[in-house]
A protein has these predicted regions:
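Compositionally biased terminal segments of proteins
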Residues: 1-229
């Protein structure tokens, strides 16, 4: 299926592609969508530019790469692409690794993903929204922040659990201060959208300060002093 005139892929497009893969496969593989791909499959976003899929099992990952190469997918530097879909990059993550983050548990574990669809050979899930927010905010671009606000706005994310899991994951990061700063930015966005209340907003500040991170969520803009521009 050629979609080269489009620059974003919808959930329907992706399911069609995976169904085509499934027809040609002679092995089973578990795929867990993450990032914008998961948000698209869960109908939180309309479409995504890149296709991000976790393949938790190494043997399945190796088989899938071999299979895709046989279908003339080729590495582009950022992932795999096909001549029929040159604008779409398929990024496959092996094990518990997503973007710059190692998940604390396998995404295949119960409650760590949401079932999207099963075919004869492919099991497709979407990373649970708590872990999805963690992986996106560890990277922490503006687009990641907006996606995470949209995910939180579904009402399917427990704020207390998110704070606890994010803090635990930060302990294992090479730059914990940076990822905590990213969480502060997210908290400010959630508070602005009235998705968390003042009490929880302050709890985030207290929690981060207990970590030694002094810059908790801001209490609002400070008045400009003479000479400020």
């Amino acid at each position: 299926m050629v979609r080269s005139k489009k620059y974003r892929i919808s959930g329907v497009d992706l399911l069609d592609t995976l169904e085509n893969w499934d027809r040609l496969m002679n092995f089973r593989v578990n795929l867990i969508a993450c990032g914008g791909t998961a948000l698209t499959l869960l109908n939180i976003k309309e479409s995504t530019k890149d296709v991000d899929l976790i393949v938790p099992e190494k043997k399945e990952y190796d088989k899938l790469i071999k299979f895709l190469m046989a279908l003339n997918y080729r590495y582009t530097g950022n992932g795999l692409a096909h001549d029929d879909d040159p604008n779409f990059i398929y990024q496959l993550w092996c094990g518990n690794r997503v973007f710059t983050t190692d998940l604390l548990e396998s995404p295949l574990k119960e409650n760590n993903h949401i079932l999207v669809k099963k075919w004869s050979h492919i099991y497709l899930g979407a990373l649970n929204l708590t872990d999805l927010i963690i992986t996106k905010m560890f990277r922490g671009t503006h687009a990641d922040r907006e996606d995470c606000i949209a995910a939180f706005a579904t009402g399917q994310v427990d704020a207390e659990n998110l704070l606890d899991k994010y803090s635990e994951a930060a302990r294992y990061d090479l730059n914990p201060e940076k990822v905590l700063e990213n969480f502060v930015n997210l908290a400010e966005g959630l508070h602005k959208e009235q998705l968390i209340n003042d009490k929880f907003y302050q709890k985030i500040s207290d929690h981060l300060q207990s970590w030694g991170y002094e810059e908790g969520p801001s209490k609002g803009p400070e008045p400009c002093s003479a000479g400020d521009h």
